[in-house]
């Protein structure tokens, strides 16, 4: 097979993390209020090596009116990639017993979520059938940083009866290093494009002069009649053709940060010793979710952000547990 060597692009990736942390706890009273403080600091250093066996493209041939084929070198080329990052993650929690029944909590800290492992794989993969409008290159990146969130929470809890309580909480999360996977147009030396090259333009002009519509099929037939194709109907690019513009899909960290904030409400009530009770909770959330269809610049609004609520009635007594739950979520 002149177009596929039989060796697919293969990549391996690892994550090696070294970390150290310190943590401390204090219990004390301030003006008859019992206070608990938990504080900590964690440092992590992560290395991301990746080895890829990559098929290297030579050229893109036009083999039929609607079919284009990427020609690759025989065998594969081994490529090594290495990424590295470090993070400092502080944490500070405070719990205050305001009364015997009311508890206040405050929390501030940073947390991370690592990039999906598939995004970290090194190497570059060209589509094997790059039709016009579908010329895609997929790349990973070992340089991706993890999502980093700064979290702020404040809540009050009222335990007004045994197994019964009500609570309200405020939260705010500011997340940076969001990953963008939108494609960008790039060219690569040596990969020339028959489409819109001099011979293509020649075919379009000749067909239009004869009153024939310049469809891909008619242009391909012109190429064959003009001797631009070999005996098998394969048209190869030449140095006069422009470089192909590939849609390169490569994950990248965004420079801006996104914010999510909201309020959480919850209540649970039990009816004495009967075993019957109910619970309800709601989360009202807002964030950077706006998208302007008239703005031509690239936009990256948060997705999946919505209000939600749950309601449950239950019976729990003498080893028997029965629950009926209703869940609701708004549009997003």
Model-derived regions, located:
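Outer-membrane beta-barrel proteins and related beta-barrel translocases across Gram-negative bacteria
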Residues: 1, 169, 176-181
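Signature of Gram-negative outer-membrane beta-barrel scaffolds
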Residues: 1-101, 115, 119, 125, ...
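Outer-membrane beta-barrel signature, preferentially recognizing the C-terminal barrel domain
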Residues: 13, 83, 112-175, 195-208, ...
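Membrane-embedded beta-strands that build the outer-membrane beta-barrel scaffold
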Residues: 18-28, 35-43, 90-98, 102-110, ...
């Amino acid at each position: 097979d002149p177009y596929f060597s039989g060796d697919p692009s293969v990549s391996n990736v690892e994550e090696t993390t070294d970390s150290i942390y310190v943590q401390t706890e204090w219990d004390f009273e301030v003006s008859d209020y019992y206070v608990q403080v938990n504080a900590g600091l964690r440092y992590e250093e992560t290395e991301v090596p990746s080895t890829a066996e990559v098929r290297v493209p030579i050229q893109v041939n036009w083999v039929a009116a609607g079919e284009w084929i990427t020609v690759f070198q025989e065998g594969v080329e081994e490529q090594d990639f290495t990424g590295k990052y470090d993070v400092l993650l502080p944490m500070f929690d405070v719990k205050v017993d305001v009364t015997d029944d009311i508890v206040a909590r405050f929390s501030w800290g940073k947390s991370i979520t690592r990039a999906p492992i598939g995004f970290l794989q090194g190497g570059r993969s060209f589509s094997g059938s790059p039709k016009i409008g579908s010329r895609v290159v997929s790349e990973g990146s070992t340089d991706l940083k993890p999502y980093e969130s700064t979290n702020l929470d404040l809540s009050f809890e009222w335990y007004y009866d045994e197994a019964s309580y009500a609570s309200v909480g405020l939260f705010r999360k500011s997340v940076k290093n969001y990953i963008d996977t939108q494609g960008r147009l790039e060219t690569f030396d040596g990969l020339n494009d028959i489409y819109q090259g001099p011979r293509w333009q020649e075919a379009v002009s000749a067909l239009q002069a004869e009153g024939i519509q310049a469809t891909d099929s008619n242009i391909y037939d012109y190429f064959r009649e003009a001797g631009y194709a070999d005996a098998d109907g394969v048209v190869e690019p030449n140095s006069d053709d422009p470089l192909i513009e590939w849609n390169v899909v490569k994950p990248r960290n965004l420079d801006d940060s996104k914010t999510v904030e909201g309020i959480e409400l919850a209540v649970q009530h039990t009816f004495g010793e009967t075993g019957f009770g109910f619970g309800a909770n709601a989360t009202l959330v807002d964030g950077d979710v706006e998208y302007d269809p008239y703005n031509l610049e690239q936009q990256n609004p948060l997705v999946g952000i919505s209000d939600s609520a749950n309601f449950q009635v239950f019976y729990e007594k003498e080893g028997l547990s029965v629950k009926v739950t209703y869940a609701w979520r708004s549009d997003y």
